[in-house]
Amino acid sequence: IRELVRSRGLGDVYKRQGIYCFSQAVNENEAREEAQACVYVLNGRQLDYPIYFDTEASGAGNGRADGLGVEDRTKCAVAFCEEVKALGYKPGVYASTTWFRKRLDMSQLSNYYIWNAHYNVASSPIACHMWQGTCTARIPGYGGQIDVNISYMG
């Protein structure tokens, strides 16, 4: 978004950067490969925020990882995060409150940054480092809708 906003003449509004990987890994090896691909694409560029393992349903509901159970999904998240850490970046996990509560074992994720998506509430219902509170915000000069995220990382 930073480059998009800058190109629309709105100035350097967004300064901190991080990335996420919409994971379709179905095992730990694939999760590590996804982490390696993220770092490869960065080509040495440093980030302010973590590299997040994004786990959520695919748009059509038929993604490779959609049917993973809690144990396997959590193993993939941990493998991704540990690989990101080994490659010199901060690791994190992105999911909705429902996914954190029902599709991941949060007790295994305490060493990683948590980015929680939960809309139409005053604050995140789970402890997190970043909270995505809406996906329908608008900013002047941009014709579409954007996500709004609140960082508690300082």
Per-segment meaning from a language model:
Residues V84, G88-R101:
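Aromatic-lined carbohydrate-recognition surfaces of secreted/lumenal glycan-active proteins
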Residues I1-Y14:
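Single conserved hydrophobic/aromatic residue that forms the stacking wall/gate
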Residues R16-F22, Y49-T55, K90-Y94, Y113-N116, ...:
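Structural recognition of the beta-strand scaffold that forms the well-ordered cores
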Residues D12, V78-C81, M106:
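Short amphipathic alpha-helical segments and helix-helix/interface helices
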Residues N27-N43, S58-A79, E83:
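Alpha-helical scaffold elements lining the catalytic groove of polysaccharide deacetylases
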Residues K15-R16, Y40-L47, E82-Y89:
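Sec-exported extracytoplasmic/periplasmic mature domains
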Residues Q24-E33, T98-K102:
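Acidic-and-aromatic substrate-binding clefts and catalytic sites of carbohydrate-active enzymes
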Residues F100, D105-G154:
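Functionally critical loop-and-helix segments that line ligand-binding/catalytic clefts
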